[in-house]
Amino acid sequence: MLKEYRTVTEVVGPLMAVEGVEGVKYDELVEIEMQTGELRRGKVLEVNGDKAMVQLFEGSAGINLKNTKVRFLGRPLEIGVSEDMLGRVFDGMGRPKDNGPNIIPEKRLDINGEAINPVARNYPSEFIQTGISAIDGLNTLVRGQKLPVFSGSGLPHKELAAQIARQAKVLNSDSKFAVVFAAIGITFEEAEFFVDEFTKTGAIDRSVLFMNLASDPAIERIATPRMALTTAEYLAYEKGMHVLVIMTDITNYCEALREVSAARKEVPGRRGYPGYLYTDLSTLYERAGRLVGKEGSITQIPILTMPEDDKTHPIPDLTGYITEGQIILSRELYKKGIMPPIDVLPSLSRLKDKGIGKGKTREDHADTMNQLFSAYAQGKQAKELAAILGESALSDVDKAYAKFAEAFENEYVSQGFTTNRTIEETLNLGWKLLKILPRTELKRIRDEYLEKYMPVGEDE
């Protein structure tokens, strides 16, 4: 029998204090009945003796201290999961948002998940093809990896997210591939874009969408990514699927954390974010991976916008510590009309070496990747030199490098948001561009690969 309390003493923002409680536990789900009969939900944030601090999911507007009834349900926040969730759109709390029927759950799972024993983890080693050359060829995504996208305000990260969700697949695998998409604190316009994009391309059939809008309570943003990850864990570890989890925008999630932390009067850390921001983010990112003995896997692509394009801001800074690399979008490339504007030099996939090579992509992948990185870096230096001293001051080799850098940005990096390149097309395009350079400059590629893969014909 659930006890009912009418001892609400204070309401501040999304927080409510209840006195005289017994047997209440941290993170327990709470049901609040308004004097109008309306039901709202919350969770226990803090317990001190017979006092409990409750965090409200739907906001505190209209709560009457005397007539509000509070029931502690004795269980954490859960989501009902089923394979029928594929092809559906839910709000940030897991309720259907597409006018479809309610899901009949196969089971209910705690959204906080369970910690994965490090010994039970399998090392990521299988290539995921996104169809985007700057990722597949140079910053390869591997199954079970967590690879964030660092973007900036106004940059086309939502188009990139939709493209990856639409095109991503595991090569040479019979297992089913699913996408779990969590939109956190986005506008109506962005939500409409994602739903339309998924629907018209057919990608929604293998996807589960969670949409938390900017107008929804900030507290809901803290639950949304956990709803998505719990669904992903169910599909991966119980249904044997390869699941790609895309979360955008992690910055909005961190802002919600800061808002709740301020309401609780906690001592702020850097830039006002709570001191436990690193720990909290790790509870999201560390839910990616592969387990020994399980066919399925969870690969994560969290997307965040860097305030003022600042890589040293606490959110990208701490994210970089936890995740295995980063894909960085460049405002400079965006202004040039290069789409997607991925800046390949500061971008990094720490596990790329594990997912490429013979039997995974192609034997020449590592050599061409190293050569393309080196040539592009030298080409950018040559272009900067030409801007200062004039093109006539460049040697013939420097001119070739400058020409290569221009072609690399316009043909390799820039492909639009609808082109889906296979890994063979990406590698062959790399060879075509390397032909611009004198053969003596290709020092990072083995002679056997030069003979086998270098396009035959007149030098450009």
Curated annotation (Swiss-Prot):
Disulfide bond in keyword set: no
One GO term of the biological process aspect: proton motive force-driven plasma membrane ATP synthesis
InterPro entries assigned to the protein according to its UniProt record, in alphabetical order: ATP-synt_VA_C, ATPase_a/bsu_AS, ATPase_F1/V1/A1_a/bsu_N, ATPase_F1/V1/A1_a/bsu_nucl-bd, P-loop_NTPase, V-ATPase_su_B/beta
Name of one Pfam family that matches: ATP-synt_ab_N
UniProt KW tRNA processing keyword: no
Database matches in HAMAP family: ATP_synth_B_arch
Family per record: Belongs to the ATPase alpha/beta chains family.
Name by which UniProt lists this protein: V-type ATP synthase beta chain
Organism: Clostridium perfringens (strain 13 / Type A)
Gene: atpB
